[in-house]
């Protein structure tokens, strides 16, 4: 049986369970599996690129994209490209606590935000390669990259 949709996955799970008393719980089992995949996997299907962050002079903190899990690479789209190095939040506070402005050199992640150091002195376009969560399967979102490319996991 090919498994390519949420309905087909639920049917396959029901076949494997071979128990009718758990059929109504199958969507819950799928949700729990998706949470585990998002927590433990870092595979190519989870990679995405965002150029949504454009800095503003003097503003150092920006919201991370929805579904962000982990940064893989982050740079300013300058000529030549300016790679941004990760430092811990503690190091960011020690090195770039003031209001000095210059071209950012480093970044850290605090909660759902990325913080740049030093404060940007101008507008810069960024490019972020990061791992994102898989789209959660449901009756309205019947497939995602995990199910399409890895239905056997």
PLM features: residue spans?
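Glycine-enriched, solvent-exposed interface loops adjoining structured elements
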Residues: 1-153
């Amino acid at each position: 049986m090919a498994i390519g949709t949420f309905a087909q996955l639920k049917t396959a799970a029901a076949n494997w369970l071979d128990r009718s008393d758990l059929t109504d719980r199958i969507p819950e089992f799928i949700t729990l599996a998706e949470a585990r995949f998002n927590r433990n996997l870092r595979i190519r299907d989870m990679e995405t690129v965002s150029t949504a962050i454009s800095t503003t002079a003097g503003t150092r903190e920006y919201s991370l994209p929805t579904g962000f899990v982990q940064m893989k690479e982050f740079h300013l789209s300058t000529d030549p490209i300016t790679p941004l190095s990760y430092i811990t939040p503690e190091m960011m506070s020690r090195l770039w606590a003031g209001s000095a402005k210059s071209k950012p050199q480093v970044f850290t992640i605090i909660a759902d935000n990325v913080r740049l150091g030093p404060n940007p002195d101008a507008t810069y376009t960024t490019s972020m390669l990061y791992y994102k969560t898989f789209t959660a399967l449901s009756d309205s979102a019947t497939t995602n990259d995990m199910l399409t490319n890895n239905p056997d996991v």
